[in-house]
Amino acid sequence: MAVQPGPPQLLQVLLTISLGSIRLIQAGAYYGIKPLPPQIPPQMPPQIPQYQPLGQQVPHMPLAKDGLTMGKEMPHAQYGKEYPHLPQYMKEVQPVPRMGKEAVPKKGKEIPLASLRGEQGPRGEPGPRGPPGPPGLPGQGIPGIKGKPGPQGYPGVGKPGMPGMPGKPGAMGMPGAKGEIGPKGEIGPMGIPGPQGPPGPHGLPGIGKPGGPGLPGQPGAKGDRGPKGPPGPPGLQGPKGEKGFGMPGLPGLKGPPGMHGPPGPVGLPGVGKPGVTGFPGPQGPLGKPGPPGEPGPQGPIGVPGVQGPPGLPGVGKPGQDGIPGQPGFPGGKGEQGLPGLPGPPGLPGVGKPGFPGPKGDRGIGGVPGALGPRGEKGPVGAPGMGGPPGEPGLPGIPGPMGPPGAIGFPGPKGEGGIVGPQGPPGPKGEPGLQGFPGKPGFLGEVGPPGIRGLPGPIGPKGEAGHKGLPGLPGVPGLLGPKGEPGIPGDQGLQGPPGIPGITGPSGPIGPPGIPGPKGEPGLPGPPGFPGVGKPGVAGLHGPPGKPGALGPQGQPGLPGPPGPPGPPGPPAVMPPTPAPQGEYLPDMGLGIDGVKTPHAYAAKKGKNGGPAYEMPAFTAELTAPFPPVGAPIKFDRLLYNGRQNYNPQTGIFTCEVPGVYYFAYHVHCKGGNVWVALFKNNEPVMYTYDEYKKGFLDQASGSAVLLLRPGDRVFLQNPSEQAAGLYAGQYVHSSFSGYLLYPM
């Protein structure tokens, strides 16, 4: 049993280590520290920090005969602050011997022991940590005095020690910092189910792992019908299902109107019948003024309208005096004027007036006098003759619109006037009266789609539409609550007879039954058929009999077997056969009885004029999957078709050369079961059935040897719609082959 070293032994070890590292020693040799091999620290779990408790066991150092340590086994002491707490430091140090020799002073000098000890130097920096030394042999020391507990050191690196005695409970410390979240614990055992609590509110749908099956609960009350969920994304196209037999369902309720689809492509301009005149639409907003148009041709002179009321008196500036015109023609004698006022009394006369003298010459026109005062308005004179047309004046201010005049007589068509300059655009006129509906024009091109208008009012309920095609299967919804048990339905109709199944394997032999009672003796049975036994052992030869009488002449015997083959004849000389004509078949070979076949169907004319012998043989492949049911399967891709006896348009092989034929077929199964039959003259001679497994591509094959005569037909056919999963693709081939074994 190892004894833990006390403080004196630890001091001795430390002094031995410090003295062993000094090179200058008077009586002894220096043993250098041999580097130790690298030690692999013990692997400990990462959750438990590596530590070394205080008071750990120091490895034992082997000693020499005189109690000194040997240099090669010098243990490595810990550096830094890892020294254990030593009470009464350097007070209980025992003298250490010097490698087996006492210290001898020099001649004439005596070195006191106290003088060898110098002053305590400053504490050096902790050196690097060395590798751990090899474990020493267990030492046997005297237990020392128990020292005072030292300060808590840094956690060491060592093996965990023996568990210590439980200490006194300390005072409650300050709450530590919140630690990191520990690893997730294992799932504990299922607890005892507690009492059922009140139903809580409906929570949000969570996403969790499926739990174990719970105990069956009591059926709850029937809940309200939930809202209709949005349609799920279209699923992948499933395999072709088997044809079902169901009763037609009731017509469904009319669904909500669908969203307005995008406008279709512009169609070709059609010519349709004129539609019914629609109601006038609401008045649109005022449009922007368009660019001024080109002046049109002058229209015919319109009917003069009724003279409007006189306008307001205008205020114009007086114009300049015009050039005096020529004197007009003398007017006619006017009417007698009114008698004038009596004049003043005249001067007294001188004499009587004389006779009037002769008319003198016309004098020069005098200067026009000043403008006299404006006379009174005379009576309206007779209309004068129309003067020459004056120059067109400036356009006046448009007057107010007068009342519509009566329709006058159409005037004569005037001459086309000179196109005047383009006037400024006039103000927008008032909307006129609605004209008569014009003739319907041709259907114009479809314009670009307009802005989507406001939703119109809800129209009347339409008639029930036709039943639509079944939609794509949606994503399976969440598992709903368990419904109430339904009413048992009526017994369904008996389905059609299914495909005959494959004969199952024979069951194991049952245990022997209990022997029954002894029966009565039966009636004697009819005589049995003559038995066929093995020939018995030949008996011994008897003595030779006496020669009998000569019998009648017998019938000629059967022909004997063919003799041995004769010597080989001279080599035959045959022209080479072109590549596309196949190999030579000399007269189609021998029959089964050794007789040559007839020459009626032995040869056909080849390209070079010689006979081209072909064997009735073919191989055809199917290129389209799922051929129709109840008709010959058309294997339409030919690999070889000798003598053209197979028709890829109908899928039927017609015999030309009588003989024994071999037929084989290879089909694939996908999306449903496969049941094919080999027919000879509309009669099935062989069936092949293969059951489809979801997710797998299976195959089936069959073959038969048939005796055919000229005109016989052979083909493959699907006899049932419930097993029509015959599949073919670009790299998955279903084939049909046949060839002549030997002619008859």
UniProtKB/Swiss-Prot annotation:
One example of the protein's molecular function in GO is: extracellular matrix structural constituent conferring tensile strength
Q: What is this protein called?
A: Collagen alpha-1(VIII) chain
Q: Name one GO cellular component term.
A: collagen-containing extracellular matrix
Compositional bias (Pro residues):
128-137, 288-298, 389-403, 558-579
Q: Which residues cross the membrane?
A: none
For region Triple-helical region, the annotated ranges are: 118-571
Annotated Basic and acidic residues bias: 101-110
What post-translational changes are documented for it? Answer: Prolines at the third position of the tripeptide repeating unit (G-X-Y) are hydroxylated in some or all of the chains.
Which GO biological process entries does UniProt record here? angiogenesis; cell adhesion
Report the gene name. COL8A1
What is the annotated quaternary arrangement, including any partners?
A: Homotrimers, or heterotrimers in association with alpha 2(VIII) type collagens. Four homotrimers can form a tetrahedron stabilized by central interacting C-terminal NC1 trimers.
In its miscellaneous comment, the UniProt entry states: 4 consecutive G-P-P tripeptides are present at the C-terminus of the triple-helical region. These may provide high thermal stability of this region.
Residues spanning the signal sequence:
1-27
What segment(s) does the record annotate as region Disordered? Answer: 101-434, 463-584
Which residues does the annotated region (Nonhelical region (NC1)) include?
572-744
**Free-text function comment from the UniProt entry:** Macromolecular component of the subendothelium. Major component of the Descemet's membrane (basement membrane) of corneal endothelial cells. Also a component of the endothelia of blood vessels. Necessary for migration and proliferation of vascular smooth muscle cells and thus, has a potential role in the maintenance of vessel wall integrity and structure, in particular in atherogenesis.
Give the species. Answer: Gallus gallus
What are the protein's UniProt keywords?
Answer: Angiogenesis, Basement membrane, Cell adhesion, Collagen, Extracellular matrix, Hydroxylation, Repeat, Secreted, Signal
Q: Where is the C1q domain?
A: 611-744
**UniProt subcellular location:** Secreted, Extracellular space, Extracellular matrix, Basement membrane
> Which InterPro entries does UniProt cross-reference here?
C1q_dom, Collagen, Collagen/C1q_domain, Tumour_necrosis_fac-like_dom
Comp. bias intervals (Gly residues): 203-217, 328-337, 411-420
Which portions of the chain have biased composition (kind: Low complexity)? 168-190, 469-506, 540-556
